[in-house]
Amino acid sequence: MGFRKILAQDQKDNMSGHDSTQRQKTLEGATAGRFVAAITVAALLTLGQGCRTGEDDVHRWANTAQGPRKLVAVLTHDKYPMDLRIEAAETLVSMKPRGGRRIGIQGTDEQQGLVDALAQMPPAPRTALIAKLVPNLQAEMAKPAPVQVVGQPAKTDMSVPYKDAAFAILTHEDGALIPDEALRKSVRASLAQWCTTNFADRLEDSSQLYGVEQVLRELKAEGVRNLPDQILPNANKLDRLAELTAELGDAETKQRAGQKLVDVAKFVNSNAWVAQKRPGVEAANKASKLTPTEDQLKGQLAQYQDEELLRVFSSMKKIGGKAVVEFLLGFVQDKAAVEKRRVAAMAALQGNLDRNSAAQAQIALSLAGDPATPDPLRDLSLARVGEFPRAMVVEKLYELFKNDKWQVRWVAASLVLKMSDTSQVQEFMSKLSSADGLAITEPLSYGGLLADLKGSTPPAELAAKYSATGNSVPARLTALSYYYAAGTPADISKIESFLKDGTAAPKCKADAKDCEWKCTVQGAAGSETKEIKTVGEFVEFCVKPALDKRAKGLSK
């Protein structure tokens, strides 16, 4: 019994120990389970936090090989917050070029850039995204451009890629990415402002995907509306400002540009301009170790002023308009002005005069007929006369046939022929008949112009008519010169009858400059100059050799 009690107690103790062990195991198992579960949750939380894309990732990807691909994924996937998607877009824009290419905007053959990625998005979410992106691009475009310092490396204009992105989005598929008209108008205004701010530097910035000129041509009149504000004394790229305004500007913009150019021209032509530039010229002389006298320095400044004023006149020619024409017409009439400058001013009037203005025509005619007018200015004055209708100016041109200088008549008569047709040849010959002191250059050139006339009567028929005896000598010589300029070997027989014509040829006035009656012929001993005293000698030594030479050329 005692044994059984001891055995029973042992069993009870054993059972108690077993139960205790089991309870401990159960407790330990439960604790371990809770620990594992906690670790798992923590790991998941940590993993979730580690995979969440943030701005730091977006910025870091700008410098990694696969960065553009990841940025496009963030941009186009709606699971990301809008602000992060916008940040991804801006990062694509601001990425440094790779291999000389802005892959963030343009993409590559293997990877989309910003614009193509936007184009692939569904319209509604894309429109919402662009509505938030574009104002950010505009804000970056509006930031001040860096101030460039002469002699130092050029500073990077950080707004360039934002301008390029805005332009690319605006123009992609004819504006399909910006259906909102108000936003499109706003972008166009921002682009115009960007191009006309710091114009000269941005015009030359080769880092742009789309140059200033390309952008302005897309914007047309709207793009250049503010360009006249850049037309100032000492402005760089004045010629390009004028050219783009002339090409793209509306009437009001061109008018403002014209007035601004007049203001610049007046300043450049002033003593104030000379005083402003003098220190720079003196410094340049010093740097070159030159020591000009006062007169030499004045000569340098005058030449500098000539060059600058001629550049302004060149820009004026492109713009035209009332203000420009009035200024230039006044300038060409100023006898105190430097001849070179007057000539340049008259050249700048080409194509800008009012064809219906008799007053403007009269200014050009008066200059052409004034004995004091320098010959280069006279020639250009007559060229400007040629821009007016024949009926308005022809009688005034005929009056110039009486000018003491044969060169004036020559240019005026040539102009009349260029403005005429064959029905008006009789009128021309009649006026030429009273001309005094012709030079041989005149009929020889008139004959060539006669050959070019249009009309119902063939020039050859007119040549035969007016070369005959009974016409005035100037008319006959002009008609015979038709054969000199345009005759064929078949015409030799037509002129041979004049070889013995003893009618006296015209004589130069005693003081006529460069006037002569001579022709050079080829003889056995070489070339020989022949004095021309008669109509027959004119035919023999001037006209017939030209036809003979033409015949030899055809026989080869």
Regions found by a protein language model. Give the residues of each.
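Amphipathic alpha-helical scaffolding segments comprising HEAT/armadillo-like alpha-solenoid repeats
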Residues: 65-75, 98-150, 175-200, 219-232, ...
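Hydrophobic helical h-region of N-terminal Sec-dependent signal peptides
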Residues: 35-45
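Structural detector for internal amphipathic alpha-helices that build alpha-solenoid repeat scaffolds
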Residues: 53-64, 83-97, 116-121, 149-182, ...
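Short extracytoplasmic
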Residues: 74-86
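N-terminal secretory signal peptides that target proteins for export/translocation
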Residues: 1-31
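N-terminal Sec signal peptide cleavage junction
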Residues: 49-51
